[in-house]
A protein has these predicted regions:
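Glycine-rich portal/gate segments that line the openings of hydrophobic small-molecule binding cavities
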Residues: 38-90
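Hydrophobic pocket/interface hotspot
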Residues: 15-20, 26, 105, 115-117, ...
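Intrinsic-disorder/low-complexity, polar/charged segments enriched in Ser/Thr/Lys/Arg/Asp/Glu/Gln
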Residues: 1-8, 52, 66, 98-100, ...
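Hydrophobic/aromatic beta-strand elements that line small-molecule binding cavities or substrate pockets
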Residues: 5-7, 66-74, 86, 99-107
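Hydrophobic ligand-binding cavity/cleft-lining segments
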Residues: 1-48
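Beta-strand/loop substructures that line and gate deep hydrophobic ligand-binding cavities in soluble
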Residues: 81-135
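Short, highly charged C-terminal tails/helix-capping segments
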Residues: 34, 38, 146-152
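Short strand-connecting beta-turns/loops that link adjacent beta-strands
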Residues: 12, 76, 108-111
Length: 152
């Protein structure tokens, strides 16, 4: 099953790229629905490249398991892609048999950028979890648009 966002962000591609690599931006985009906390207690200033960061999560204040964030970057022409090879490690989302998350930004002629966010999940639990994931992705997209409008 797939959740997709295709949005215009009111910032240039450099700012959007920085936001995709910022733990603070992720926390803002997910709040107050999902509250992650680093297992080791310390937030990095940026996500380390190709290194898994373990996070304990709370959804709407209720413990909801552990996930990892592990970013790998790719550039295809003027499109910059982040592959998050992390995913659920425990909790309800761990019932999914696969989790593939990609985000991409590309410049628009007017100086803003296009943001695409795609999550593919599978498994017996996917149909039941899809509505919640879809709603969370819509919220993330809205909050990222708010953050992109702010001065960097």
């Amino acid at each position: 099953m797939r959740v997709v966002l295709d949005l215009v962000l009111d910032c240039d591609v450099e700012r959007a790229w920085a936001l995709l690599h910022s733990p603070a931006a992720m926390r803002f985009a997910m709040a107050p629905v999902l509250a992650p906390t680093p297992v080791d207690g310390a937030w990095p200033s940026t996500w380390p490249a190709a290194t898994a960061v373990a996070l304990d999560t709370r959804m709407l204040g209720v413990p909801s398991g552990r996930m990892t964030v592990e970013l790998h970057d790719e550039v295809r022409g003027d499109v910059r892609i982040v592959h998050d090879r992390g995913g659920p490690q425990s909790g309800p989302l761990d019932a999914l048999s696969s989790w593939r998350h990609r985000m991409a930004v590309s410049p628009l002629p007017d100086g803003r950028c296009r943001f695409r966010d795609r999550l593919d999940v599978s498994g017996a639990a996917a149909p039941a979890m899809w509505p919640t994931l879809w709603a969370l992705w819509q919220w993330r997209g809205h909050r990222l648009q708010v953050l992109a409008r702010r001065e960097g």
